[in-house]
Amino acid sequence: QMYFDLLKFPYPSEQKGVIERLVSENLISDHFDGTFTIANIGAILLAKNLNDFPTIKRKAARVIVYKGESKLETVSDLQGEKGYAVGFIGLVKYVMDKLPQNEIIEDAIRKSIKLVPEVVIRELLANALRL
């Protein structure tokens, strides 16, 4: 269902339609005996939990935040568990929350201004996760 939600496709009313679509996109392989194999690309993109796939769980996204410019002290180290497509929005949000920001007061209201636009982070992460 995640595949259809992410691409904003209507979810097929029958299981056969779901399987046909996933096979046509090479996300699963049909063995024609009622069994299917999830392709690595399907798992790494759409897994709700990459730990369910031992051969690719080490490919999970990982974000390390260092204190200052040295790599000796880490502030946080987070290893993702979701597939790239499923967890992408959360990954962007997490990185944006870790970036430095300035505060300004405008009309008696305090506002936080990010030093790096979200579109830049989104593109950077998309390129870093390129398969």
Task: Give a label for each model feature.
Residues 1-131:
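Active-site helix-to-loop segments that bind/position phosphate- or nucleotide-bearing substrates
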